[in-house]
Amino acid sequence: MPEFVVDGKAITRDGPAYVIAEIGHNHQGDVEKAKALIHAAQECGADAVKLQKRDNRRLYTRALYDSPYDNEHSFGATYGEHREALELSAAEWLELREFSREEGITLFGTVFDEESADFLAELGLPAFKIASADLVNTPLLRHVAGLGKPVFISTGGGTLEDVELAVETVLTVNSQLCLLQCTASYPCEVDELNLKVIETYRERFPDLVIGLSDHQSGIAMALVGYMLGARVLEKHFTLNHAWKGSDHAFSLMPEGLRRLVRDLRRVPDALGDGVKRPLPSEERPLEKMGKKLVAARDLPAGHVLGPGDIVARSPVDGGLPPYELDGLLGRRLGHPLVSDQDITFEDVEPVEELAARGVEQA
């Protein structure tokens, strides 16, 4: 069975969910906030946390870097200043690597350029993520794949042909690839999720683990994604929806992430084995609420039972089940019964006597 191994943990096409808490830049460039987010994600049961790394001077044109950036989420007067304010230093990345190891949660990053990929590789992080914006950036894909670490690729905004090109580019040099269905809007509306693409990917790429990078607020659609075959589930994560930054509003808070992890872990148990059978936990409720056949009223000995003489009432309590009704109709009582008394086959004439009277049962 194909598997995708991250930091010693094997992720398979039909195994348990691997949950990534996407911190991105929700730390606002503050290493202490980053630590708080990492700690909270670990407490919620996430398998990994993910940050983002950019070399902004190399990544953007001078015009974009120097362009005014004045809005409620801005951390600088220009777009370049804004992006630089959100970056962590090399020393802070090292600090977070050590902190994550102490916390017992995997840390890796989305890289937007080759220099950032090389930096995280030198830091010894165990995997890379490629964002949807770089789905067709084959030079970056080739470079990151060549670093020999597992690669996640988000596929928002792409066609199947784009995805096939990305897969071919990576697999040429690196077999450790996971595709994530994604819609590259923030937040994503429910009718834009196109979760059935997960099934398309599983059919088209049978040797790859498939996942979902979910930008929709809430947890229900991630659970649907799991049921469709996504085994990596990525959700944005914050500690405060009101914090400055465009991603906080649709990110999960700790309680939401905790519930998502809990529910994903429960799904395999809830699915069961497909064999329909009574369960021990059902015995008492069904004994109380189930039905047995009893006398509808006081009935004398010798009375020939008709439809109005027998009713189904609770509790079961060892009586005959309702499906035995037809086997009692038309037969004489061997002794009187009081209202609500159980009726059994021992209470009526034998079948042989019934036949001798020329009565046919249903």
Summary of predicted features, one role per range:
Residues 1-362:
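Catalytic cores and adjacent flexible loops of soluble metabolic enzymes
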